[in-house]
Amino acid sequence: DTLPVLPRDATDRNRTSPFAFTGNKFEFRAPGSSQSCAGPMMTLNTIVAESLDSLAEELSSFAPETFLPQLQETLKRRISEHKRIIFNGDNYSEEWVKEAERRGLPNLKNTMTALHTLVNEKNVALFEKYGVFSRRELESRFEIFLEEYHRRIRIEGRLSWEMAATIILPALRNEYEQTVSALSRALDAKRTSGTAALQKLADKLGDALDSIVSDLDTLETALTSCHEDILVAMSQLRTSVDAAETLVNDRSWPLPKYREMLFIY
């Protein structure tokens, strides 16, 4: 009549879970540095409360003489019904994305999609059932989160524009001017060796300049539009800046590179 011994998982696999259950507790790893864990904890507690409520209601209907056999069947059925959410691989991998799709699990790939789940009828009904939030309280929080998200995206977009225009572009322009000057001197001296390489580098630097200037114009226009346009423009600008980083002299590049941030700073 006692519960069986359940071995405790001693591995570190849960490092890839957004809120990992590590033996006797949940660890929340998805919230950002400026966010509170209170929201995820409140939601998880409400979900657990509904699960326990549903289970208690079912168990209370069992007759004492058949309680244990029915309990075993109930536990087996519950595990079978919800086993699809268990994944013991790498949650960051493409394997899990494909596996989740095969299992019919939702995959919310951006903030806007995730925010809208707050006012889904199913979720509203859950919070109202247990007196956690009313519909209007959820709608007001959704509106606040939405407004805050738009504000942050515009701030990030404006900062991306300023960094590219005032830090990256001058460094790239200087590199282009130095390369063109070296090419001009080589041609004036009627040198044949090295001029083709200088010409090729100058062309690449010039293309990178044109690309970044064009992306800056696109981002500046997007900043007056919706968040989707800003995100697309920021992504394109980032691609152009990453390409420019490979062309500029390491000593002239004004920002830390990935390898420096990972292994030096």
Predicted regions and their residues:
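Acidic, glycine-enriched catalytic cores built around paired aspartates
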Residues: D1-Y265
